[in-house]
């Protein structure tokens, strides 16, 4: 079958930016029956890219891009997408690049749909969010399910509630799979630093755990949810309490990892105080009806919903005008490349 006719069988053309852990998992999903309507026309990591159909079809594409392929050129990738005969054209951003996120609005304005796991725009400065909303007026769509809860149905549920005239009043929960794992497992029987090293070795934290411990990733997720609920919150309006002591914030990663024991005494003290009151420690995000937002470590009673989480579970408790007696709770695994990639695929398929 001629290449042109073969391509016409596909409903959705995709360019994938980022072939790391999440992007690699997304590539694997493209080889499943669920992705039969998708046509990958370009893929790139931070340095190299591939747009040749035969190369893109190879199952070891991610590994090949580590050493082969043309130099990264987004103009070439977009040209490949524009040249496709597919009715729906999608850019998938599986990176954490702030620079790439800043281009989402530009791509939307050009008529491309964008599906992303990148929180830098939706959870960044407020002007960027407003630029994004303005770009959506052109008719292109923005799939961001993977930015919160590794694809748990948080944003989709919130949007449906708003479409039905409901409104978010308060929000509380555990929004980080890594911090959930750490405090679900921290019982004072061994140092926090030992648990942190274990979590890092298992891939539950970033290579530099300060990315998790700072609370900034949780703050981005809180902003994304709040903004989708109608709260025009700026980054500086979220109170973020970092778990990283001031002396450890500016040093390089190697030195930080060598000094993890400096986290032990402060957290052991907080744990002992909480235990004496019958409470446990959890790293919570909270938003109230007045738009006051806070992210940080708090004590909660043993019967609190967040005290009964397991592993890397995330939990989102939404109180709305209609769910006001008891909150609507969404809970499940909040970390992992496979579930995040599945959320990306789900958003792409919803565009077809």
Regions found by a protein language model. Name each.
Residues 110-114, 177:
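Glycine-enriched alpha-helix->loop->beta-strand junction motifs that scaffold or abut catalytic
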Residues 58-62, 132-135, 160-162:
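Short, hinge-like loop/turn segments at secondary-structure boundaries
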Residues 2-16, 20-29, 36-39, 151-173, ...:
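NAD(P)-dependent dehydrogenase/reductase Rossmann-like domain
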Residues 148:
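Cytosolic ligand/metal-binding cores
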Residues 90-93, 114-117, 142-145, 170-173, ...:
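General beta-strand structural signal in soluble alpha/beta enzymes
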Residues 2-110:
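N-terminal glycine-/serine-/threonine-rich beta1-alpha1-beta2 phosphate-ribose binding loop
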Residues 87, 138-142, 166:
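A short helix-to-beta-strand connector/capping loop
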Residues 97-109, 119-144, 152-158:
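Rossmann-fold NAD(P)-binding glycine/threonine-rich loop
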């Amino acid at each position: 079958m001629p290449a042109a006719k073969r391509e016409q069988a596909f409903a959705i053309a995709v360019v994938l930016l980022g072939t790391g852990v999440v992007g690699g998992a997304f590539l694997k999903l493209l080889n499943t029956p669920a992705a039969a309507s998708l046509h990958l026309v370009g893929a790139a990591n931070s340095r190299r890219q591939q747009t040749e159909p035969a190369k893109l079809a190879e199952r070891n594409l991610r590994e090949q891009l580590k050493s082969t392929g043309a130099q990264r050129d987004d103009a070439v990738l977009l040209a490949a997408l524009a040249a496709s005969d597919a009715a729906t054209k999608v850019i998938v951003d599986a990176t954490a690049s702030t620079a790439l996120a800043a281009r989402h609005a530009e791509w939307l304005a050009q008529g491309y749909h964008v599906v992303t796991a990148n929180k830098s725009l939706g959870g960044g400065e407020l002007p960027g969010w407003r630029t994004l909303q303005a770009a959506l007026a052109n008719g292109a769509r923005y799939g961001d399910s993977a930015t919160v809860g590794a694809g748990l149905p948080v944003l989709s549920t919130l949007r449906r509630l708003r479409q039905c005239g409901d409104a978010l009043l308060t929000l509380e929960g555990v929004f980080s799979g890594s911090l959930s794992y750490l405090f679900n497992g921290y019982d004072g029987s061994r140092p926090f630093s030992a648990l942190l090293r274990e979590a890092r070795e298992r891939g539950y934290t970033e290579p530099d755990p300060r990315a998790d411990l700072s609370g900034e990733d949780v703050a981005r997720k809180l902003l994304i949810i709040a903004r989708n609920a109608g709260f025009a919150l700026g980054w500086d309006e979220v109170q973020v309490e970092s778990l990283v002591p001031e002396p450890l914030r500016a040093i390089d990663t190697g030195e930080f990892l060598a000094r993890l024991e400096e986290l032990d005494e402060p957290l052991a003290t907080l744990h002992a105080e909480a235990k004496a009151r019958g409470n446990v420690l959890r790293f919570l995000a909270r938003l109230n009806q007045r738009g006051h937002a806070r992210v940080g470590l708090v004590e909660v009673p043993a019967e609190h919903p967040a005290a009964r989480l397991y592993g890397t579970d995330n939990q989102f408790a939404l109180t709305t005008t209609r769910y006001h007696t008891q909150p609507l709770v969404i809970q499940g695994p909040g970390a992992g490349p496979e579930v995040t990639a599945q959320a990306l695929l789900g958003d792409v398929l919803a565009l077809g």
